[in-house]
Amino acid sequence: MQDIQLDKRLSELLSQAVTPQNAQPLMQALCQSLNEHNIRYYVDDAPSITDSEYDRLMQRLKQLEAEYPQFVAADSPTQRVGGMALAKFEQITHLKPMLSLDNAFDEADFSAFHKRVSDRVGEVSFCCEPKLDGLAVSILYRNGVLERAATRGDGTVGEDITENVKTIKSIPLKLRGDNYPELVEVRGEAFMPKAAFEALNERARLKDEKLFVNPRNAAAGSLRQLDSKITASRALSFYAYALGVVEPTSHELAKTHYEQLQQLKSWGLPVSSEIKVCDELSQVFAYYQDILTRRADLPFEIDGVVMKVNDIAQQQTLGFVAKSPRWAIAYKFPAQEEMTLLEGVDFQVGRTGAVTPVARLKPVFVGGVTVSNATLHNADEIERLGVMVGDTVIIRRAGDVIPQIVAIVPERRPEDAKAIAFPQHCPVCGSLVERLEGEAVTRCSGGLFCEAQRKEAIKHFASRKALDIDGMGDKIVEQLIDKELVQSPADLFKLTASMMTMLDRMGMKSATNLAQAIEAAKTTTLPRFLYALGIREVGEATAANLATHFGSLEALRVATIEQLIQVEDIGEVVAQHVAHFFAQPHNLEVIDALITAGVNWPTIAAPSADEQPLKGQTWVLTGTLNQLNRNDAKAQLQALGAKVAGSVSKNTDCLVAGEAAGSKLAKAQELGVKVIGEDELLALLANS
């Protein structure tokens, strides 16, 4: 109740015009709110607002303090770094304060920072690095041996997490070599990689335990475990980003920040491979855009990039203000999480009959776009979140990922909030819905009787990766079904140009072009045909593996589950889906109707070992290929027996690097994976 009253009071004050009379109570309310959110974020590991909303409140307080300096409070969050040491850990006073960074939110902000710096010290270069979304850590080495580790805490006093830090495998217990100082403090970020975060939450989900909202909370919670065995099980990582205290001070250190990071690396400390020195302002902005573009593909969460004056002498000249260095700034990305209101829930039916709840949201700008809908996945997810209509929810949108609700803000729940009821009947056709034992998804039982499944199945059949009917977009498919011109995939091949002129905004010329595209699509490949059928969990790669293994549709139709499991990358679940599909009479009728309509493909000869020289190898494609379509390259590699993966790992045999290859290339080089260019790939394909 106190939280609700605090938010209500703050909202009332923020809605008023600021005057000398009400400025002080507004600033006090902002301080109180921000300090409360600091405790939730740093102490409880349970934030109730997003980073972007916190930033907005902080910016508002800074503006007011600049305008009314006489009202600046001693407990204002602008007067300290932020965060508190937990009493349950031994408290450690830092040998040198661990300060935070000022923020830039756009090019104008950074340009102003650049001008302030260059006005003081002249021409500058910047060492640029990703701003990891984890927990700042100080690690003290004495005579090369890890002696102590602490959190940043409030910047002056932190928490002793030595035993927990020792469990992070990427942190050396003893420095490499012998050219390090007698005493050296290493500062960096402890974080949880995305893959480790997903695995941690999956384990929690199976045990019906509370899930972490994001990797940052998971990392913070893991480092604050009293039992270091729990920390050890959490697969944390660490990147060093600066030197702290060094004794003796006479020890020779590198003269630039970038070179000091390389020194740290030479001592055995992990340093990000994404660090780059930029000499021009335009290079800084290009670096920012490059990292922003690749943000979703990076193996760790970041919320911006950090720009530091590279020359150490210039850093010393610039010095510090009360809570941050003058020589560094965090250039923040657009927020990936925002808070908004859940106004209602709709239920959509997909091509496989899956009934998916979709949240209707009060529109909010997040991840670079305005979001008004978000997936709720299934009934289990609704129950896990405890979400109700009317709740204030936290929305996350990362890269091209569909926006989703990751948490609710329980203290903002209104009294008239309504529970979300899953329908008992299909919202499209009225058929009963069913949920099979062991499955999370609820499905409509109507099959092709259900218009939604019919529409989505035919859209999928005509899509680019399936039969690739040029010009057959979603809206045209919907019209064809609405006007009862098409009831099944085979009906597409009965369409004539004159029939399609019945569609909205479809003249004879466009109809003729579409009719020709339909005719051309009759000649396809067996992998595309199998993918087009929409068999559950059979994507492009699985369809290609099935076609390669069995060689013909006839052989696949009669394959047993035991035979299907022999196919590369097919387990028992997918094998059951495939066998079940071909056991259904109505599916066989659809296939026969398509073949009768003239759909055909060249015969695939069962490959010999000589024809699959890449069998057992894992390949990855990255960058832009100029002479070969990415999907064609993937298909040809698969035909040679290769598995084509989406990410580089120690199990990768070869990376094909096209133009503008980014993090995958760097990862491959780091792991010693073989790298070839497009010309070498073309030569390989030509000779195989």
UniProtKB/Swiss-Prot annotation:
Residues 609-688 form the BRCT domain. NAD(+) binds at D51, S52, E53, Y54, D55, S100, L101, E129, R152, E189, K308, K332. The keyword Transmembrane helix does not apply. GO terms for cellular component: cytosol. GO terms for biological process: DNA repair; DNA replication. CDD domains: BRCT_DNA_ligase_like (cd17748), LIGANc (cd00114). GO terms for molecular function: DNA binding; DNA ligase (NAD+) activity; metal ion binding. It catalyses: NAD(+) + (deoxyribonucleotide)n-3'-hydroxyl + 5'-phospho-(deoxyribonucleotide)m = (deoxyribonucleotide)n+m + AMP + beta-nicotinamide D-nucleotide. Its EC number is 6.5.1.2. Its cofactor is Mg(2+); Mn(2+). Pfam families: BRCT (PF00533), DNA_ligase_aden (PF01653), DNA_ligase_OB (PF03120), DNA_ligase_ZBD (PF03119), HHH_2 (PF12826). Zn(2+) binds at C426, C429, C444, C450. SUPFAM superfamilies: BRCT domain, DNA ligase/mRNA capping enzyme, catalytic domain, Nucleic acid-binding proteins, RuvA domain 2-like. Keywords: DNA damage, DNA repair, DNA replication, Ligase, Magnesium, Manganese, Metal-binding, NAD, Zinc. The active site is at K131 (n6-amp-lysine intermediate). DNA ligase that catalyzes the formation of phosphodiester linkages between 5'-phosphoryl and 3'-hydroxyl groups in double-stranded DNA using NAD as a coenzyme and as the energy source for the reaction. It is essential for DNA replication and repair of damaged DNA. Belongs to the NAD-dependent DNA ligase family. LigA subfamily. This is DNA ligase. The gene is ligA.
